[in-house]
Amino acid sequence: MQIFVKTLTGKTITLEVEPSDTIENVKAKIQDKEGIPPDQQRLIFAGKQLEDGRTLSDYNIQKESTLHLVLRLRGGAKKRKKKNYSTPKKIKHKRKKVKLAVLKYYKVDENGKIHRLRRECPGENCGAGVFMAAHEDRHYCGKCNLTFVFSKPEEK
């Protein structure tokens, strides 16, 4: 029986085959006519790629059917290298949770009276509970940048 093979260039080749012929035999006949090696050939019929071990009758290829020949693509995506870091990644700082941390701001004396150890910021932007940092020579509010500097008597 006669089948047609349409190449990528649009040229149609006529082949004389039998329904019992394998796809490998068809590819060998295409190599004889066109010079394309069988390992680079891909034959498509009815939207399916034809496998080498099967016969034309397995795919229901009848007389005057048209197969489409496309070339196999070599290679693929370029292999990417895994990044190697010379220095280890910096560990993100985790804030330490201290239970009952508010107790360090207050002190209870022997009479049961509560005294503040830190000064609250009197600024309008800062509400109640915003304490000023106690430095050696000043109190400083980190929220509104208010600073109270202590004046020490000069030693003579």
Swiss-Prot record:
Gene Ontology CC: cytoplasm; cytosol; cytosolic ribosome; cytosolic small ribosomal subunit; nucleolus; nucleoplasm; nucleus; small-subunit processome
InterPro entries per record: Ribosomal_eS31 (IPR002906), Ribosomal_eS31_euk-type_sf (IPR038582), Ribosomal_zn-bd (IPR011332), Ubiquitin-like_dom (IPR000626), Ubiquitin-like_domsf (IPR029071), Ubiquitin_CS (IPR019954), Ubiquitin_dom (IPR019956), Ubiquitin_ubiquitin-like (IPR050158)
TM spans (from-to): none
Q: Where is this site: Essential for function?
A: H68
Glycyl lysine isopeptide (Gly-Lys) (interchain with K-? in acceptor proteins), cross-linked positions: G76
Q: Which UniProt keywords apply?
A: Cytoplasm, Isopeptide bond, Metal-binding, Nucleus, Ribonucleoprotein, Ribosomal protein, Ubl conjugation, Zinc, Zinc-finger
Q: Gene3D superfamilies in the record, alphabetically? A: 6.20.50.150, Phosphatidylinositol 3-kinase Catalytic Subunit, Chain A, domain 1
Tell me, what is an example of a GO biological process annotation in this record?
A: ribosomal small subunit biogenesis
Provide the GO MF annotations for this entry. Answer: protein tag activity; structural constituent of ribosome; ubiquitin protein ligase binding; zinc ion binding
The covalently linked position for Glycyl lysine isopeptide (Lys-Gly) (interchain with G-Cter in ubiquitin), per the record, is: K48
Q: Does the keyword Nucleus apply?
A: yes
Swiss-Prot/TrEMBL site (Interacts with activating enzyme) positions: R54, R72
Ubiquitin-like domain ranges (all copies): 1-76
- Pfam families from the xrefs? Ribosomal_S27, ubiquitin
Chain positions of all zinc fingers (C4-type): 121-144
Can you tell me which family this protein belongs to? In the N-terminal section; belongs to the ubiquitin family.
Share any extra remarks: In Drosophila ubiquitin is encoded by 3 different genes. RpL40 and RpS27A genes code for a single copy of ubiquitin fused to the ribosomal proteins eL40 and eS31, respectively. Ubi-p63E gene codes for a polyubiquitin precursor with exact head to tail repeats. For a better understanding, features related to ubiquitin are only indicated for the first chain.
Q: What is this protein called?
A: Ubiquitin-ribosomal protein eS31 fusion protein
